[in-house]
Amino acid sequence: MKKIVALILALVFVLSMSALADAATGADVKGTGVELTIYTNSGSSGRADWLKERAAQDGYNLTIVEEGAGAVQQRLINEGEATPCDVVFGLNAIIWNDLIARDILVAIDAPSWADEVSEGLNDPNGYYYAIVKQAILLAYDSNQLSPEEAPKDWPDLWEKEEFWTKYESQIKLTGGTTRNVLAGILTRYVDPDGELGISEEGWNAIGEFFAHGTPVEDGVDLYAQMVNENSPVLIGQMWSSGADQYDEQYGVKTGYAVPEVGVPYAVEGVAIVKTTKNFDEAQRFVEWFGSAQIQGEWSEQFKTMPANELAAEKAPASQIEMCSIPAQDIDWALVAANIDAWCEKIMLEYMQ
């Protein structure tokens, strides 16, 4: 009889512990040690190492593959159903929409923290959930240009002669920030009857944009040009979390335009790859990684702006200010469907 009672009590204990595990949410959701392969463009500057070590503390066993956003996208496309990837995070709305269209991601039930994310950033159909937001800025060195002297919006660069040669012109169009900038310009000129969905006025604007800039030197960042006395460049594109890092590195004080139409946002998200063989563990990781606790720690470590509003208090004041700029109204599905063709046309016809 005692053995039966002991067995019953043991069974009750196991079931109770299982129920508690199922009830856990956010950062309380622990990993089981099943290996997850993660692709990201957000692993540089120590991010991948930090995440691997922090996740291990809570039972997750991560293998992280870090490449540029476009390279991650292309790797997933090329590998197809043979991809070892379980989870992908980072990227931007352009790439997310392309991966959705290619049926590479799987829609999942909303994690417990989804409602804590700023409105409009999560995919409405559950394919990805936002973790970090980056404002894509028209930045300048405020030590050399006052707010009154600086451009107020991108068209000022080619419409006002005083800015000619003073802004950088990209020589590669594969980067996520560059493509967000181009999307922010071209979608002001949407015309269903125009070439690639853009009006003649829009293509003329892009032509002027590239005609009057100073081509960036390969491998030389914007801020290195700003502090170089032999370079005319004072203005260019920058993502919000990069501004603080470069200010500290170069002794520059970033100023930035606040256009009436708003600015593009690169929404870094987290998603599960459709072909994963470790779905349950992947879902546990998504629940853990996007939580206010973990995203707050990530923000403190890397000066990012969390999409999770409960984690936002951990962000630097400068990030809160930059990411308070309203988001530009952009049809990201339209952009995802056309960005490659737009960039090809620009490279062939407008880049010097």
Please provide the spans of the model-predicted regions:
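Extracellular/periplasmic bilobal clamshell ligand-binding domains
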Residues: A315-Q352
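Periplasmic-binding protein-like
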Residues: D115, Q134, A205-F209, Y250-K274
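Paired acidic/hydrophobic, glycine-rich loop segments that form the ligand-binding mouth/hinge
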Residues: P84-G90, P215, P232-W239, G255
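Mature extracytoplasmic/periplasmic domains
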Residues: V263-P264, E268, V273-I330
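Extracytoplasmic ligand-binding site segments that recognize negatively charged/polar headgroups
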Residues: T37, N41-A48, P84-C85, G90-V227
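A ligand-binding cleft/hinge motif common to bilobed small-molecule-binding domains
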Residues: I94-D98, V233-K253
